[in-house]
């Protein structure tokens, strides 16, 4: 069985964060948009669960392409780096839209932006075997449901997914006290990080 770190990285990649888009001029397919949006809630839960353990945060200057070159105030589109797992911040732009690997901002000075993004996860903190198993199974079933587009498979996968997601929520709630205790301990030891 995969380690929690491998599972977390695989899950982030599977859930629409790395759709097959290699050319910024290629339109993002509707299916990619739906796929990314469908997993948004689960993705947020996964990211929230592992956020304290994200590592390898990169800052990257990205050049973009104006959507309307004739308009100096045109929105600009950018393509996230291939290694980007999770976009944390676009400097100076609170109003931006993500479509798979494509980022669209209303206006970018000098047609360039700086991204802060997570390149990898090295430690996922507190995990449980039950979480590993149910989450990997849920992802597998959801991927089958989405990719096959078979009505029966969809219904079966969705039922199973909802059941496993409920179990995930229960496990997450159960571990809340442990996580809080762990967080407080880390804060208390902050002056001496090497002891952690």
Model features per residue range: what roles?
Residues 20-25, 68-73, 106-111:
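Intrinsically disordered, low-complexity coil segments
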Residues 7, 91-196:
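Internal mixed-charge
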Residues 27-46, 153-170:
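Short secondary-structure subsegments characteristic of cysteine-rich extracellular domains
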């Amino acid at each position: 069985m995969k380690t929690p770190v491998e599972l977390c990285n695989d899950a982030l990649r599977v859930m629409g964060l790395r759709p097959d888009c290699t050319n910024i001029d290629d339109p993002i397919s509707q299916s990619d948009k739906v796929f990314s949006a469908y997993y948004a809630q689960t993705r947020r839960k996964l990211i929230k669960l592992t956020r304290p353990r994200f590592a390898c945060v990169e800052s990257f200057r990205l050049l973009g392409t104006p959507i309307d070159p004739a308009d100096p105030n045109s929105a600009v589109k950018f393509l996230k780096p291939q290694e980007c797992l999770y976009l944390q911040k676009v400097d100076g732009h609170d109003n931006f839209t993500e479509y798979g690997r494509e980022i669209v901002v209303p206006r970018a000075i000098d047609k360039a932006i700086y991204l802060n993004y997570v390149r990898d996860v090295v430690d996922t903190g507190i995990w449980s075997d039950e979480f590993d198993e149910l989450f990997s199974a849920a992802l597998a079933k959801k991927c089958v449901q989405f990719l096959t587009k078979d009505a029966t498979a969809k219904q079966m996968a969705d039922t199973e997914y909802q059941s496993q997601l409920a179990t995930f929520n229960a496990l997450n709630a159960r571990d809340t006290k442990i996580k809080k205790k762990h967080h407080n301990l880390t804060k208390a030891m902050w002056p001496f990080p090497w002891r952690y």
